[in-house]
Each structure stands twice: as C-alpha cells, then as structure tokens.
UniProtKB/Swiss-Prot annotation:
Protein name: Uncharacterized 8.6 kDa protein
Highest taxon in the source lineage: Viruses
Length: 77
C-alpha cells in the first residue's frame, strides 16, 4: 500500500520569519536554522483560509514561516 506524504518546512531565525517566498526556498532549505517537527496538523476555520499547528517533542508550537511544500510517495505497509 502506498500513501502520499506532504512535507512542510518551517524556518526559525530568532523566532522571526526570515522568508516565506517559495522562490527562495531552495536556498533557505540549506540553512542550519531549519527546524524539524514530529507532528503537523492543518484545520480550516471560517475566519481564515487555514490554520497550521505542529508539535515538537510533545510541546505545542505556533506556526512560523511555511517556506516550502513538496509531496512524495511513501510505502505504508
């Protein structure tokens, strides 16, 4: 069985958004400031288009800059 996996990358630099432009993502993704996460959820709300949140080490975190998105196929066996 195969499933699609969406990979979202957030960039932290002193808790500030550095760059959200996707045309800069290739350069930014080489930065040491990329933070990894263990869980990501997306929910739709009437007030906004979407709300992103994720947890890191079982601690809830606020979303910062979404700088890149890609999809790949993973083996879900």
């Amino acid at each position: 069985m195969f499933a699609n996996a969406i990979h979202l990358y957030f960039l932290f630099v002193n808790s500030q958004c550095l760059d959200t432009r996707l045309d800069r993502a290739t350069t930014i993704l080489e930065s040491q400031h990329i933070i990894s996460f263990t869980k990501l959820t997306k929910s739709n709300s009437p007030e906004s288009e979407s709300t992103l949140s994720f947890s890191l080490n079982n601690r809830s975190m606020s979303p910062y800059c979404l700088i890149a998105k890609s999809s790949s196929v993973i083996n879900a066996e």
